[in-house]
Amino acid sequence: MTIAKDLKQAPWRFSIGDESQGIFRKLAEGISTRIFSGENVMLSVVKHEPNSTGTVHSHPEEQWGVIIEGECVRTQGDEEVPMKAGDFWSTPGGVTHGIRTSELGATVLDIFSPPREEYKKHGKGFSSSV
């Protein structure tokens, strides 16, 4: 038996490529996420289709993000910064932010602490009010 086969059986093992896992949420046209929440932290695997633009928004939770593949322009506060696979950022709670992609699109892993309550269930939009 291989190590990979043993891990596949573990209920705490997840895969970015397995779209059957996580809580699905459509954030905007061309942008969707799968959410994995623990008690104190939440992961969100966000798929940004090519040439998509997310709503600039804010929330009280701290957010870190890393681009797994593709590229984007990250807006944070009054700044816009080009980002590519391997780049990551930190966003304090309450700071406005958003992403727009090029023809490459992007996959982003977002990390929230504490977990966002509205993301603990299926839904749509960047917040519970959308």
Model segments located where?
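Short strand-coil-strand connectors
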Residues: 39, 75-79, 102
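Ligand-binding loop in jelly-roll beta-barrel domains
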Residues: 93-118
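Short acidic-glycine-tyrosine-enriched beta hairpin
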Residues: 78-93
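Conserved short histidine dyad/triad with adjacent acidic residue
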Residues: 28, 44-58
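A short, N-terminal "cap"/entry segment at the start of jelly-roll beta-barrel domains
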Residues: 1-40, 123-130
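Structural motif
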Residues: 42, 71-73, 96, 105
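Histidine-centered catalytic micro-motifs
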Residues: 55-62, 95
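Glycine- and acidic-residue-biased ligand/ion/polar-headgroup-sensing regions
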Residues: 61-72, 77
